[in-house]
Amino acid sequence: MRVLITGGSGYIGRRLAASLAADQHEVISLSRRPETAPPQSGVRFIKWDARTAEGDWVNELAGAQGIVNLAGASIGKGRWTRQRMAQILSSRLSATSAIVEAINRTPADRRPSVLVNASGIDYYGNRGDELVTEESEPGDSFLARVSQQWEAAARQAQPLGVRVVLLRTALVFGRGALAFRLLTLPFRVFAGGPLGDGRQWFTWIHVDDHVGLYRLALENPQVSGPVNAVAPDVRRQREVAREIGRVLHRPAVVPAPTPLLRLVLGAQSHLLLDGRHAVPARARAAGYAFRFAGLHEALEDTLRAR
């Protein structure tokens, strides 16, 4: 099949593209700066501006079986000023609206059958000890509102006859994943420990399973709507800190107090202090078998492998 990937030059995009290309699928990666993207075997890079339904990529959409939308400003880079928060939202909405408009311009019999749109597990906000599935109500934090609006923009493809899957992703465990590197860095310098009181539930997913769920969404026509991209082994954050310390042979006793995190990070502290006990109900119902279902094995693979 032919698959287009927006944000394809990023960490997840390149991993997904490699997986698809290895199985002889035609992969087209859309990038604002394709000339700077490192070459990737079996992947063709095409320019797009992530704002308008114009350019060669629109022609490539005709006859494609699927499009994966990963485009959007990073939530982990830079302090969350008002300007940055507006950019986080607008970058996602403009890119997604451009995709939907391009689909609308494509003849009905040539449209992709599926749009797989990234979203975040922060959709649910801070949920305490509540068990969260794809049927749970949304939260009201900044990222919850971003996720809701992003998903609403993607759902506009449904009336056009396109199956829409919304991957609500937890923190990705991968050596090239920025958030994971930031999470584990304090432990490497003997300064790791719980964040806040450490009681918040911590959701995560290994990058191989993250890619696997994108493949499931692309290839299984029975999968639609929201899918929690989380591993089954959800833990309290303090347990995750201890496990990271154990794998790295480092102590996990230096806490980052809630007031300090809020003072230093402002609204961004919600990324570390909010939690939700989200489970992969729909992935399991679709028969997905996690390669890394347990926290320890996922950390061992990510932190110790070279």
Where in the sequence are the language-model features?
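Alpha-helical substrate-binding/gating segment
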Residues: 184-192, 200-234
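C-terminal amphipathic/interface module of NAD(P)-dependent oxidoreductases
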Residues: 270-306
